[in-house]
């Protein structure tokens, strides 16, 4: 069984570790590794994680026994924090968990990030009329479409509108339709006659008693929350509450 990281030193190559400490212009202040399947609770993956931990601490012990100071050690990222007991390390790398998610809705975390935009305008289409690039949306009946001021240039996956993406407006779920544009997208607000320009639309977060979680968006796009949240662009205004 091999335990090789993307960029690090093979754990069994103690000589390479020693040579790093002997570099004149390098001051090592810490040693770390990364658990590649800490998000999985299958028996096979739990065993793999256990062996990774054992190998890591073996390398740390070797350094200490041979007079090399490993400094601060760390190996747990968010999933490792949630799925493993506390480790004898100096740090834990809580990344995605700081947003209140780590990939599973049932992990007990409370989301702290919301993504909202506004309605630019509302258009009424007659039955048979089309809207958007490629004329991708066709109104089967008289339909009210709200145009939202957010698009794929802000980091949203373009596939979201094609895979059942939703928003919350006035506490009600509204389906995304047509093709997402660079700066805008359409949602069907036919049943919400009071929706008008300036209304807030929630893509991630709560509106009234309903909620849209980033895990749902990720599942619809065939990806993970980490990717979606890291894609959110600098064009978005950030409000810290």
Region annotations inferred by a language model:
Residues 124-241:
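C-terminal accessory subdomain/extension
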Residues 3-126, 193:
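Active-site loop/helix belt of alpha/beta enzymes
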């Amino acid at each position: 069984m091999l335990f090789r990281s993307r960029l690090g030193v093979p754990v069994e190559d103690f000589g390479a570790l020693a040579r790093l400490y002997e570099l004149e212009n390098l001051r090592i202040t810490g040693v770390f590794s990364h658990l590649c399947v800490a998000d999985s609770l299958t028996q096979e993956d739990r065993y793999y994680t256990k062996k990774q931990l054992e190998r890591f601490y073996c390398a740390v012990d070797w350094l200490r026994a041979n007079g090399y100071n490993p400094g601060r050690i760390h190996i747990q990222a968010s999933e490792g924090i949630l799925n493993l007991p506390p480790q004898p390390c100096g740090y834990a790398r809580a990344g995605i968990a700081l947003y209140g998610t780590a990939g599973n809705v049932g992990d007990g975390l409370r989301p702290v990030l919301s993504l909202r935009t506004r309605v630019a305008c509302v258009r009424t289409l007659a039955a048979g009329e089309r809207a958007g690039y490629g004329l991708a949306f066709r109104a089967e009946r008289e339909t009210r479409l709200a145009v939202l001021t957010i698009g794929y240039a802000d980091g949203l996956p373009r596939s979201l509108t094609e895979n059942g993406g939703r928003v919350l407006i006035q506490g009600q779920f509204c389906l995304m339709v047509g093709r997402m544009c660079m700066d805008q997208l359409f949602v069907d607000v036919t049943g919400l006659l009071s929706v008008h320009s300036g209304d807030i639309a929630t893509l991630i977060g709560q509106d009234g008693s309903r909620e849209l979680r980033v895990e749902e968006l990720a599942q619809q796009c065939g990806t993970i929350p980490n990717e979606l949240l890291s894609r959110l662009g600098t064009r978005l205004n950030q409000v810290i509450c």
